[in-house]
């Protein structure tokens, strides 16, 4: 196997690990063994006899943990798909959207290699209450939430949000904002109106929390 292919497989393996971590961090059941799948095992499982990755085989379903269901009753199951095609057109995206609809997934995560055509992107917001999210493989090679400068973000439930606003006598409009396009908001799958608790380290007080609403 040539070095270029080895590098590409290594990057894909790291992107796969980030997706597993992301799904786990959202409150879905993913084992630590799945997250820590060694590179050699990844190759054996997801590459053909010529050493070429078979992205379609990397797709998986995840279900919420019991703790997540108690906090987020509408969470539902999730489907992740890695696309074999370098460029994604309407036909491929339509097949993905129909799969999410027919199998009653609450969330569909579509991981693509190079680009998605504008026409295909128009299908993304087309199936409420289900949500379709798209991620570029290259953006997943490194898990941004593991960077030392990125503080811990925790999504609040509706009850926790209500309690927060009541405790501090705030209106939603008074909370600082986090944009839906923010990398951490995308990582957590935040929706408009949801609140995150952000825990930062402080030299004087150990740790302190702030809150932002997704807009």
Curated annotation (Swiss-Prot):
InterPro entries with a match to the protein in the record: Arch_Rpo5/euc_Rpb5, RNA_pol_Rpb5_N, RNA_pol_Rpb5_N_sf, RNA_pol_subH/Rpb5_C, RNA_pol_subH/Rpb5_CS, RPB5-like_sf
Cell compartment(s), UniProt: Nucleus
Gene Ontology MF annotations: DNA binding; DNA-directed RNA polymerase activity
A GO BP annotation: transcription initiation at RNA polymerase II promoter
UniProt keyword annotations, A-Z: DNA-binding, DNA-directed RNA polymerase, Nucleus, Ribosome biogenesis, Transcription
GO cellular component, one term: nucleus
Keyword Transcription recorded: yes
Transmembrane segments: none
Subunit structure: Component of the RNA polymerase I (Pol I), RNA polymerase II (Pol II) and RNA polymerase III (Pol III) complexes. Component of the RNA polymerase I (Pol I) complex consisting of 14 subunits: RPA135, RPA190, RPC40, RPA14, RPB5, RPO26, RPA43, RPB8, RPA12, RPB10, RPC19, RPC10, RPA49 and RPA34. The complex is composed of a horseshoe-shaped core containing ten subunits (RPA135, RPA190, RPB5, RPO26, RPB8, RPB10, RPC10, RPA12, RPC19 and RPC40) where RPA135 and RPA190 form the DNA-binding cleft.
Role, per record: DNA-dependent RNA polymerases catalyze the transcription of DNA into RNA using the four ribonucleoside triphosphates as substrates. Common component of RNA polymerases I, II and III which synthesize ribosomal RNA precursors, mRNA precursors and many functional non-coding RNAs, and small RNAs, such as 5S rRNA and tRNAs, respectively. Pol II is the central component of the basal RNA polymerase II transcription machinery. RNA polymerase complexes are composed of mobile elements that move relative to each other.
Family statement: Belongs to the archaeal Rpo5/eukaryotic RPB5 RNA polymerase subunit family.
Official protein name in the record: DNA-directed RNA polymerases I, II, and III subunit RPABC1
Organism: Saccharomyces cerevisiae (strain ATCC 204508 / S288c) (Baker's yeast)
Lineage, highest ranks first: Eukaryota, Fungi, Dikarya, Ascomycota, Saccharomycotina
Gene from which the chain derives: RPB5
């Amino acid at each position: 196997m040539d070095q270029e292919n080895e590098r590409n497989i290594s990057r894909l393996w790291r992107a796969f690990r980030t997706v597993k971590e992301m799904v786990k961090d959202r409150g879905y059941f993913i084992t630590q063994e799945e997250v820590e799948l060694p590179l050699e095992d990844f190759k054996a499982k997801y590459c053909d006899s010529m050493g070429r990755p078979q992205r379609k085989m990397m797709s998986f379903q995840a279900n919420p943990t019991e703790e997540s269901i108690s906090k987020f009753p509408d969470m539902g199951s999730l489907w992740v798909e890695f696309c074999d095609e370098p460029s994604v057109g309407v036909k491929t995206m339509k097949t993905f959207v129909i799969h999410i609809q027919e199998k009653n997934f609450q969330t569909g995560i579509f991981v693509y290699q190079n680009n998605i055509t504008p026409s295909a992107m128009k299908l993304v917001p087309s199936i409420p209450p289900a949500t379709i999210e798209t991620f570029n493989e290259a953006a997943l090679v490194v898990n941004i939430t593991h960077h030392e400068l990125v503080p811990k973000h925790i999504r609040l439930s509706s009850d926790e949000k209500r309690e927060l606003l009541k405790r501090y006598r705030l209106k939603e409009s008074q909370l600082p904002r986090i944009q839906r396009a923010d990398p951490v908001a995308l990582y957590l799958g935040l929706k408009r109106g949801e609140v995150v608790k952000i825990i930062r380290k402080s030299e004087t007080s150990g740790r302190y929390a702030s809150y932002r609403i997704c807009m």
